[in-house]
Each structure stands twice: as structure tokens, then as C-alpha cells.
Amino acid sequence: MRCLENHDQPRICSFIKDPLALENFTAFLYFLKGTTLLYAGQEFCCTEIPSLFEKDVFHRTLGDISSWFVKLNQLKKTVLSCEDAFVGKADDKHDIAILERNDTKVRKLGIFSLKGKKADVKVEFLDGTYTNHLDGSSITVKNGMLSCNGKPIVLTFSVE
């Protein structure tokens, strides 16, 4: 199981304040292999750890990112495969995670700017223009580089 928060660690929104960084961390979580665990109230950007033994009402005034969870869950079910091989790399200079999943038919590339910042990123992906599965935008890979605008990117291409 993979999670950003649970009952014995601080809430992700208690230390990731930038919404774009949170969007990237959440997309990163879903791109990882394994079951994604969401902790109660995470969809409302809660910052306080709820009690395990007392009734606790979630404050819904901080935000509602449940629609983002729905989109990422759909990606996990339709684009990613439990049969994928997985490789993770990092661009430490720009705080960007570069993840690749690959089965025998489709390569999947995930670019996650963990600070929500723009940067040019070196990738091992064929030159061309691809559709970002997360927002429908066009992403161009040229000479093994792509431009990340700070938002998470998931690209695919067939290897058959």
C-alpha cells in the first residue's frame, strides 16, 4: 500500500502548502505501483490528525480535491497496469520525480514537480508530441527534453 498520510504521521497539507505541489505529490502517489491508500479527510485537505477513538468531523473549508482523486483513480485503472515494470529517477536540482512504468505494449512516463516549479527535464522517451493524460495538454519531447510547467505530466506511447 502507498500513502501520503495515515493515522501515525502528519497530514500532507500540514506541511505542503502549495496547491500545485500537493497536486504533484498526489499524482506521484497514484503513479506508484501498488494500492493507493487515502486517509479520512485527505480529500478535504485537512491539516489536523483525527482521533482514532473519538468522533471527529472533517473541516471542509480548506478545499475539496476529491475530483482530482477520481481523475487519478481513472488513470490508474485505464492507463497503468499491475504488470508494469517500474523505474524511478530524480532531477534533484529541480525537485522533480521522473517515473517510468512499462509493460510489453506501452511505456508510461510520469513527471512530478514536487515543488510545483517549472523546469526543463531530461527524459528517456521518443521525440514527439504527446497528450498529457491528466489534463489533455500537448507535451513535446525534443532531443530527450521536455518542458514541465509545474503541473504533473503522464505520457504514454505504444511499443508494439
Question: What name fits each language-model region?
Answer:
Residues 46-94:
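Aromatic- and carboxylate-lined catalytic core of secreted/periplasmic carbohydrate-active enzymes
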Residues 3, 25, 68-72, 153:
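Alpha-helical packing segments of well-folded alpha/beta enzyme cores
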Residues 140-160:
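C-terminal beta-strand-rich structural cap/linker in extracellular carbohydrate-active enzymes
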Residues 89-124:
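Carbohydrate-binding surface patches
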Residues 1-36, 40, 44, 91-93:
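Alpha-amylase-like alpha-glycosidases and glucanotransferases acting on alpha-linked glucans and related
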Residues 9, 31, 52, 59, ...:
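Substrate-binding and catalytic surfaces of secreted/luminal carbohydrate-active proteins
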Residues 124-136:
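Solvent-exposed beta-hairpin/edge-strand motifs
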